[in-house]
């Protein structure tokens, strides 16, 4: 699972800079002469730059997370007015972008234009579903946004600290806007499941009850660069703690009171998103946006059933090799078996680190290009761990000297299974998220927005595909570890079944849990957390298998077409060197590569 740095959330209206090139195109149109390739390329690149700069200005948290400090003292406007104003601006961008004739553009230019058209189209369609009315759940929201941001930034100057203090003072305004949005959601009957918000409330209360000096919002003052004078350090400490104590903790407390007294009583009892107004239509939209395909919920459900059956057939082979009469006997043997549980939180963390380190040594045999950005394996913050996934990856940022981070959930560590740890380390770290996302950020000669595209089917599909690459380099030698790999794979197949089950076929939460129990030996802690995740984050879990199956199909196609010319390093490079793509554009890219390799001398 990948958590991105703070992206566009809800934006303040910002007038766009007038394009000097638009009149240029208009002049050509009026004269009856087509605009030259040079003129059209200039318009395209100016539009890309305008969009990117507007995006950063409207989402200052995202800008800061990338190392752009121009907006470090500002926070986003979370109001519906701001969101609708930004959608109107995107409509303007879309109209201008669609009017640019792509004839003669490079493949990169054509792809960039097409990607942005799709992004704008999706954003405009999402307006109908008023996503801002359900802004929090047990996985996060406004209550976790700024603690996470504090952890992503680096503080090297007095201005960095003063900018943070300005943000701390503004946080209550953001909380107030979000509470207003939630209240509107009550009126519109667009509310999350009650029990998930009860879990979120626990996290809000935890953050609200901390001493100012213990709050993650005050984390930046725990360490100062030596260049900052002692007197300034004391001033910064005083002002930071005052902002947290007098502004932010009361804001958390107000949010907690609103959630407990007003919001939770109004939240829905049904788990599926289809129970909200236009919920079925919304789920169809989420499927298209998440998978970048036209697959229906019914088709995805069937794919999930088929993949579960395929994985179970492979698991049976391992079970028989290990001397078990059937798969059920193997599952019963490993489930809740202390042999496969970590002895301590430190032991669990060490297991992830060891697998990631071993894989790093094998990367040159799988890839022609490796990222410059380092990554580290760390413990997940306590305020996220209670209801968080087993692990997640957070993007790094070279401009902030921030490595990519594989965060491990150490809560209830001794109740977790070690069996999926090897595959998860490859998924979240290398050659999964860290390698793909970091290489995407390091792309050259592309519009800036392309470095940070995050199509879930591509990003998570690649990471799930990456779990299998351990087999290619001789890992998973222990049959139990290979069984753990298949447990991870069937986990993602189960997602197709239970996500569509709850949101499209009106399954209950217990039906989801029962399906997990029937088809996996995943530990209970993860089953419960994952079930809640799919309920609270509709369709996101559909991306993993969808993307993985596409990449596997493209690899199989390339191997068959190229025969001895097939180079696994070159294939991987062509898949990930252009950043995240919609799956159909990825297929076009790989097909073009296959054609070029077919005609090249061996």
Question: Model regions: which residues?
Answer:
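N-terminal secretory signal peptides that target proteins for export/translocation
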Residues: 1-6
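Short, cationic motifs built from Arg/Lys/His that form the positively charged side of catalytic pockets
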Residues: 7-8, 555
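Bacterial N-terminal signal peptides
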Residues: 12-23
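N-terminal maturation segment of proteins
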Residues: 28-602
């Amino acid at each position: 699972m990948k958590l991105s740095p703070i992206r566009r959330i809800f934006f303040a209206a910002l007038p766009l800079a007038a394009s000097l090139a638009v009149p240029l195109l208009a002049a050509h149109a009026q004269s009856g002469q087509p605009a030259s390739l040079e003129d059209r390329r200039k318009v395209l690149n100016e539009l890309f730059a305008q969009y990117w700069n507007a995006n950063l200005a409207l989402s200052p948290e995202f800008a800061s997370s990338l190392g752009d400090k121009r907006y470090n003292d500002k926070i986003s406007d979370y109001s519906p007015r701001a969101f609708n104003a930004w959608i109107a601006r995107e409509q303007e961008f879309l109209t201008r972008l669609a009017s640019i004739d792509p004839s003669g553009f490079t493949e990169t230019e054509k792809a960039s234009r097409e990607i942005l058209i799709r992004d704008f189209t999706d954003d405009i369609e999402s307006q109908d579903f008023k996503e801002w009315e359900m802004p929090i759940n047990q996985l996060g929201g406004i209550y976790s946004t700024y603690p996470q941001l504090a952890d992503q930034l680096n503080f090297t100057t007095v201005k960095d600290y003063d900018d943070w203090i300005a943000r701390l003072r503004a946080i209550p305004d953001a909380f107030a806007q979000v509470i207003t949005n939630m209240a509107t959601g009550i009126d519109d009957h667009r509310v999350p499941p009650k029990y998930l918000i009860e879990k979120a409330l626990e996290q809000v209360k935890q953050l609200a009850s901390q001493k100012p000096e213990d709050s993650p919002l005050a984390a930046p003052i725990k360490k100062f660069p030596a260049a900052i004078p002692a007197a300034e350090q004391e001033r910064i400490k005083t002002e930071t703690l005052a902002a947290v104590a007098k502004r932010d903790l009361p804001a958390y407390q107000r949010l907690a009171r609103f959630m407990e007294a007003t919001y939770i009583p109004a939240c829905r009892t049904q788990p599926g998103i289809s129970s909200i107004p236009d919920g079925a239509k919304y789920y169809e939209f989420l499927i298209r946006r998440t998978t970048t395909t036209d697959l229906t919920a019914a088709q995805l459900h069937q794919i999930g059933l088929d993949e579960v059956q395929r994985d179970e057939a492979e698991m049976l082979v391992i079970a028989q090799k290990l001397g078990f009469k059937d798969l059920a006997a193997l599952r019963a043997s490993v489930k809740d078996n202390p042999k496969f549980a970590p002895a301590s939180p430190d032991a669990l963390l060490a297991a992830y680190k060891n697998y990631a380190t071993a894989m790093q040594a094998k990367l040159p045999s799988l890839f022609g290009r490796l990222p410059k950005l380092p990554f580290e394996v760390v413990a997940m913050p306590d305020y996220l761990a209670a209801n968080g996934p087993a692990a997640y990856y957070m993007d790094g940022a070279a401009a902030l000297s921030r490595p990519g981070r594989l965060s491990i959930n150490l809560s209830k560590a001794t109740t977790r299974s070690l069996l999926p740890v090897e595959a998860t380390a490859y998924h979240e770290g290398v050659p999964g998220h860290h390698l793909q996302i970091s290489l995407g950020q390091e792309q050259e000669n592309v519009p800036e927005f392309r470095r940070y595209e995050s199509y879930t089917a591509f990003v998570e599909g690649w990471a799930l595909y990456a779990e299998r690459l351990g087999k290619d380099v001789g890992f998973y030698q222990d049959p139990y570890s290979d069984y753990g790999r298949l447990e991870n794979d069937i986990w993602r197949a189960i997602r197709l079944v239970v996500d569509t089950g709850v949101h499209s076929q009106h399954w209950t939460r217990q039906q989801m849990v029962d399906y997990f129990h029937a088809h996996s030996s995943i530990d209970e802690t993860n089953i419960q957390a994952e079930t809640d995740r799919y309920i609270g984050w509709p369709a996101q879990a559909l991306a993993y298998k969808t993307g993985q199956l596409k990449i596997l199909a493209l690899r199989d196609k390339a191997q068959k077409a190229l025969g001895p010319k097939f180079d696994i390093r070159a294939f991987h490079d062509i898949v990930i060197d252009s950043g995240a793509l919609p799956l159909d554009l990825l297929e076009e890219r790989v097909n073009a590569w296959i054609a070029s390799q077919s005609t090249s001398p061996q």
